[in-house]
């Protein structure tokens, strides 16, 4: 009976946390809406930076290669975090963890070779 009571208190504290987090978020949103200023002038949707009206066209076109490089960076950065976590727990994981990390690194290298092969990392098109 005591074990069930402890389990209920753990769930109850988690539910309190969720409830108060949602309440606090809704309270902050409502407060900002209630206290925030409202501008109904014609300049409301005019873009500006530091109080200065922009000159020229504000729509810039970037090459898709910038986005590809950013996506590749994020992907390989996340894998670096996984490898860091593995290196911290290498003593506890033993040989099985070493083999799994080796397979993971091999998949990373294969994906990098695939990106080089399809020329996804080439900046200049031929």
UniProtKB/Swiss-Prot annotation:
Keyword Repeat among record annotations: no
Keywords attached to this entry: Cell membrane, Membrane, NAD, Quinone, Translocase, Transmembrane, Transmembrane helix, Transport, Ubiquinone
EC number, as in UniProt: 7.1.1.-
Any Pfam family hit: Oxidored_q4
Membrane topology: Multi-pass membrane protein
Chief place where the protein resides: membrane
Recorded GO CC terms: NADH dehydrogenase complex; plasma membrane
Membrane keyword on record: yes
Annotated compartments: Cell membrane
The reaction(s) this protein catalyses: a quinone + NADH + 5 H(+)(in) = a quinol + NAD(+) + 4 H(+)(out)
Molecular-function GO terms, alphabetical: NADH dehydrogenase (ubiquinone) activity; NADH:ubiquinone reductase (non-electrogenic) activity; quinone binding
Transmembrane regions listed in the UniProt entry: 14-34, 66-86, 96-116
Family: Belongs to the complex I subunit 3 family.
Function: NDH-1 shuttles electrons from NADH, via FMN and iron-sulfur (Fe-S) centers, to quinones in the respiratory chain. The immediate electron acceptor for the enzyme in this species is believed to be ubiquinone. Couples the redox reaction to proton translocation (for every two electrons transferred, four hydrogen ions are translocated across the cytoplasmic membrane), and thus conserves the redox energy in a proton gradient.
Subunit structure: NDH-1 is composed of 13 different subunits. Subunits NuoA, H, J, K, L, M, N constitute the membrane sector of the complex.
Protein name listed in UniProt: NADH-quinone oxidoreductase subunit A
Organism per entry: Buchnera aphidicola subsp. Schizaphis graminum (strain Sg)
